[in-house]
Regions:
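SAM/dcSAM-binding transferase cores
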Residues: 3-50, 223, 244-302
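The AdoMet/dcAdoMet-binding core of the Class I SAM-like
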Residues: 10-20, 44, 69-203, 213-217, ...
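Glycine-rich, charged/polar anion/phosphate-binding loops
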Residues: 34-37, 47, 156, 233-238
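N-terminal glycine-rich anion-binding loops that anchor highly charged ligand groups
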Residues: 49-59
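Glycine-centered loop/turn positions within well-structured domains
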Residues: 58-59, 157, 257-259
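A general beta-strand register signal
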Residues: 62-63
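C-terminal substrate-binding/active-site "lid" region of AdoMet-derived donor-dependent transferases
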Residues: 182-259
């Protein structure tokens, strides 16, 4: 079942909240959210974690004051990183999620009955603990699913283990921006390890920034992917609270078909209907359209 989405207040005016969360990820631009209740405010070994309810965006988690997930628009991110490659592949059994401690992506992957194993590897156990407590509407089913394994570990190191070699049909990199502990999840060594952990014919998908404010991420990521994978590319989603409009998602395959071909899109639409997949964002029409790039984004593709 699709998850119920919280709605903003219908009142035209409201009393301003006493506390406001301000995000300043991009130079010269900021977004703010009025907070109604703070649920968690902790500093882990790696980052400052806050979870709070808001007037307009539902429940929100920030890491070092940068929005990571909101209950209102998480599906636009999780659905597209997950279902698009899974439906075009058609036989995904083993999935690894790099990061993703809120388990929103894991929840989507587990909707596919042919999946035998989902392994989520996040370096910050406090993120996992707090998300389990406060984002149950999103992740409660995933935490209870016997196919789900949660590892508190360095995903970069995990990918390099002998036990990870040729293990996964799909690897989803729900990585943060390339700062702090997230730096290791970018660059040639990371992509080489992803390739090594994929089965032949497997796919990987990656968060690749907001092109309006981070255009270089697309060019750099696709250049690096092309060094390790015979086929790779770009597609888009729209996640309102990831400021900047379009969200860039990249893909690569270890010997599989290119994503987004006419044949692949038809295959995915047929599978979507057959398994009666229910999503808040993804559908076959979105799948077909997501590979269309505005000219200014297409110019960023090397």
């Amino acid at each position: 079942m699709a998850r119920p989405q919280p709605q903003p207040s219908k009142t035209k005016t409201h009393k301003a909240s006493d506390e406001v969360q301000v995000e300043r990820l991009h130079k010269g631009y900021a977004q703010s959210m009025e907070i109604t209740k703070v649920l968690a405010d902790e500093k882990s070994k790696y980052q400052h974690i806050r979870i709070f309810d808001t007037v307009a965006n539902g429940r929100v988690m920030t890491l070092d004051d940068i929005v990571q997930i909101t209950s209102r628009d998480e599906s636009a991110y999780a659905d597209m990183l997950t279902h698009l490659p899974m439906l075009e592949h058609g036989k995904v059994e083993r999935v690894m999620i790099v990061g993703g401690g809120d388990l929103s992506i894991a929840d989507e992957a587990l909707k596919h009955k042919n999946v035998k194993e989902v392994v989520l590897v996040d370096i910050d156990g406090d993120v996992i603990r707090l998300c389990k407590k406060h984002f149950g509407a999103i992740n409660a089913k995933a935490f209870k699913d016997k196919r789900m394994t949660v590892e508190v570990a360095d995903a970069f190191e995990y990918l390099g283990r002998k036990s990870s070699k040729n293990r996964f049909d799909l690897i989803i990199a729900d990585r943060p921006d390339p700062v702090g502990p997230g730096k290791a999840l970018f660059g040639e060594t990371f992509y080489d390890r992803v390739k090594g952990a994929l089965k032949p014919g497997g796919y990987a998908t990656f968060q690749t920034g907001v092109p309006f404010y981070q255009p270089w991420e697309i060019t750099e990521a696709l250049q690096e992917l092309a060094r390790f994978f015979p086929k790779s590319g770009l597609y888009l989603s729209v996640v309102p609270t990831y400021i900047g409009g379009f969200m860039a998602l990249s893909w690569a395959t270890k010997g599989g078909n290119a994503l987004g071909t006419e044949k692949g899109i038809k295959k995915a639409a047929k599978a979507y209907k057959k398994i009666k997949l229910q999503c808040d964002y993804y559908n076959p029409a979105i799948h077909a359209a997501t590979f269309a790039l505005p000219n200014w984004i297409a110019k960023l593709v090397p």
